[in-house]
A protein has these predicted regions:
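Nucleotidyltransferase catalytic core that binds NTPs
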Residues: 1-137
């Protein structure tokens, strides 16, 4: 089953089935990637080296605005997805829905079941990454 490199959040179930059929280890990265720069490219290359399939969970325009502030995003989610999908190291871009809750991010991570959750030291790590990490209560 062939699937576009750009996947909508609402097609997550079908996407997970495709990943299972492909086999191999999945590396999951999350972020805004609003103004793609060399730091992003190096990070994505390094993340891709950790497994067989690199999936970028791309934040919505609404979430990017909340994380980055007024005037952001510069590029819409569709444009950011197209740019990311053109990079050879990126296998899939999963366009996240707006207003996801911590539990949505956790469920997404459980369903995709990555071998590696690649985290940047940058502040852009986003709610996706912080929600995916265990909380100490």
């Amino acid at each position: 089953m062939m699937m576009s490199k750009i996947v909508d959040y609402y097609d997550l179930g079908q996407f997970v089935e495709v990943l299972k059929k492909l086999g191999g280890s999945v590396v999951l990265v999350g972020g805004c990637f609003d103004i793609l720069h060399i730091g992003h490219v190096r990070f994505l290359k390094k993340a891709r080296e950790q497994g067989d399939i690199l999936v970028v969970a791309l934040e919505s325009d609404e979430t990017t605005k909340k994380l980055k502030g007024e005037g952001r995003p510069i590029n819409t989610q569709d444009v950011r997805a197209e740019i990311l999908s053109s990079l050879e190291m990126v296998d899939y871009v999963l366009k996240l829905a707006p207003n996801l809750l911590d539990n949505d991010y956790l469920e997404l991570t459980r369903k995709i079941a990555p071998k590696v959750l690649a985290v940047s030291e940058e502040k852009e790590a986003s709610s996706f990454l912080s929600a995916s990490q265990p909380k100490n209560d």
